[in-house]
Each structure stands twice: as C-alpha cells, then as structure tokens.
Amino acid sequence: MKFSILPMIASAMAVSISYDPIYAADLSMGSVACSNGDHGLMAQYPTLGEVPGFPNVGGIPDIAGWDSPSCGTCWKVTIPNGNSIFIRGVDSGRGGFNVNPTAFTKLVGSTEAGRVDNVNYVQVDLSNCINGAN
C-alpha cells in the first residue's frame, strides 16, 4: 500500500498568521502576486474588495510569487486555541499567512497580538471562502 505524506506536510509545518492593513477593499489587484497571468485574479476582480470572501483574504504560504497556481485558493487556518477561519489566497505570504486586519480580528479576537505562531492550515474547497462560511 502506498501513502502520500504531502497533504500532511503543509498542515504540520509551523507557520504564523499576522495582519497588514494594506489588504484593504480598495487595494488594486495589480499590487498583489495574483494580479495577472494564467492564474491572475485582476481581470475578474479589479480591487481586493471585489474578491468573493473579502475581507478574509491575504498572503498565504503556498503562493511563492507572481502567477502562482495557488492564487484564489481557500485555506482553513486554525490557531492553537482551536479557533479557525477560511482565508482566500491572493498574495505571497512569505512562509506564513498575512491577512486583512478584520479577518485577523475574527480569528484572534483583536489585532493586539499582531501575530500568532504555530498555526495549522489545510487547503479546502473554494466554496468555504465564497459562501460566507466564516
């Protein structure tokens, strides 16, 4: 029997989640890694606020740079206390999650912490991000 550990590796890695006010509704999609190209989102959504799932958007670990195949994907992010949220990837997270402040507040309770470490994450169906599951 053959098992693949690749899906488990992503969620087992220790990453952090932080927030950045740059991920505002009026931010041009031309400013993020998922702007244009084959996997770009700008043609459909000129501003970040138009992306279904906003404000639960931001940089994710699986987007390394421009035109990543992970652009627009949905991720369930769980912090150590068990709280979780769905985040739609629109930018590079540079090894972690960096999200809209409102999404961070939904997850953590406030922006006071600034960052939470030891975050688990797993890719989920896009419907979790666009159907108001948060």
Swiss-Prot record:
Cell compartments where the protein resides: Secreted; Secreted, Cell wall
SUPFAM superfamilies, alphabetized: Barwin-like endoglucanases
Region spans: Binding of oligomers of N-acetylglucosamine (GlcNAc): 18-20, 113-116
Annotated spans, Binding of N-acetylglucosamine tetramer (GlcNAc-4): 31-43, 65-68, 91-95
Native organism taxonomy: Eukaryota, Fungi, Dikarya, Ascomycota, Pezizomycotina
Function: Phytotoxin which causes production of phytoalexin in platanus acerifolia, platanus occidentalis and platanus orientalis. Induces cell necrosis in tobacco leaves, and in callus cells and leaves of P.acerifolia. Induces reactive oxygen species (ROS) synthesis, nitric oxide (NO) production and mitogen-activated protein kinases (MAPKs) phosphorylation in the leaves of A.thaliana and P.acerifolia.
Keyword presence, Signal: yes
Disulphides: 34-71, 74-129
Record's keyword terms, sorted: Cell wall, Disulfide bond, Secreted, Signal, Toxin
Protein name in UniProt: Cerato-platanin
Oligomeric and partner information: Monomer.
Stated family: Belongs to the cerato-platanin family.
Biotechnology: applications noted: Generated Asn-98 mutant protein displays improved cellulose weakening activity, thus making it a potential candidate in the production of biofuel as an enhancer of enzymatic hydrolysis of cellulosic materials.
Effect of residue 91 to A: No change in structure, but a dramatic change in thermal resistance and thermodynamic stability likely due to loss of a negative charge
Temperature dependence of activity: Optimum temperature is 38 degrees Celsius for the non-enzymatic cellulose weakening activity.
Superkingdom assignment: Eukaryota
Span of the signal peptide: 1-14
Native source species: Ceratocystis fimbriata f. sp. platani
GO molecular function: chitin binding; toxin activity
Gene Ontology cellular-component terms listed: ascospore wall; extraorganismal space; fungal-type cell wall; hyphal cell wall
Annotated GO biological process: modulation of process of another organism
InterPro entries: Cerato-platanin (IPR010829), RlpA-like_sf (IPR036908)
pH dependence: Optimum pH is 5.0 for the non-enzymatic cellulose weakening activity.
